[in-house]
Amino acid sequence: MSSGGLLLLLGLLTLCAELTPVSSQIRPAFCYEDPPFFQKCGAFVDSYYFNRSRITCVHFFYGQCDVNQNHFTTMSECNRVCHG
């Protein structure tokens, strides 16, 4: 293969890597768990969870029950951990 062909192949592979959707990236398993809705162990606080069907972080009121880890204090933290 010529050097031009190799450069073209390398460019295409780089482009494909950049276009890989976030949904195919690996997320922690707890991002796919349901958040602890309607469970009250303390005061309800504004929180965010990763909604696996919408593939985005969503606001909810967290009752402070540590059922799983799919709850975050900020949208940016949720996005960083689960959305990519």
UniProtKB/Swiss-Prot annotation:
GO molecular function annotations of the record: ion channel regulator activity; serine-type endopeptidase inhibitor activity; toxin activity
Compartments in which it is found: Secreted
Tissue and organ distribution: Expressed by the venom gland.
Matching PROSITE patterns: BPTI_KUNITZ_2
Major place of residence: secreted
Residues modified as Pyrrolidone carboxylic acid: Q25
Pfam family, one: Kunitz_BPTI
Keywords annotated in UniProt: Disulfide bond, Ion channel impairing toxin, Protease inhibitor, Proton-gated sodium channel impairing toxin, Pyrrolidone carboxylic acid, Secreted, Serine protease inhibitor, Signal, Toxin
InterPro entries reported in the protein's UniProt record: Kunitz_BPTI, Kunitz_BPTI_sf
GO cellular component: extracellular region
Domain (BPTI/Kunitz inhibitor) ranges: 31-82
Signal sequence coordinates: 1-24
Keyword Disulfide bond: yes
Recorded coiled-coil stretches: none
Disulfide bonds: C31-C82, C41-C65, C57-C78
Family as reported in the entry's similarity comment: Belongs to the venom Kunitz-type family.
Domain remark text: The toxin-channel complex has a triskelion-like shape with one toxin heterodimer radiating from each ASIC1 subunit. Toxin subunits protrude from the edges of the channel trimer, with each heterodimer interacting almost exclusively with a single subunit.
Function: MitTx, a heteromeric complex between Kunitz- and phospholipase-A2-like proteins, potently, persistently and selectively activates rat and chicken acid-sensing ion channel ASIC1. Both alternatively spliced rat isoforms ASIC1a and ASIC1b are activated, with a higher potency for ASIC1a (EC(50)=9.4 nM) vs ASIC1b (EC(50)=23 nM). The rat ASIC3 subtype is also sensitive to the heterodimer, but with a lower potency (EC(50)=830 nM). On rat ASIC2a, the toxin shows a very weak activation, but produces a remarkable potentiation (>100-fold) of protons when the extracellular pH drops below neutrality.
Subunit-level organization: Heterodimer of an alpha (Kunitz-type) and a beta (phospholipase A2 homolog) chains; non-covalently-linked.
Something else known: Negative results: the heterodimeric toxin does not affect ASIC2b, ASIC4, Asic2a-Asic3 heterotrimer, Kv2.1/KCNB1, Cav3.3/CACNA1I, ENaC alpha/beta/gamma (SCNN1A/SCNN1B/SCNN1G), TRPA1, TRPV1, TRPV3, TRPM8, P2X2/P2RX2, and 5-HT3/HTR3A channels.
Protein name as it appears in the record: Kunitz-type neurotoxin MitTx-alpha
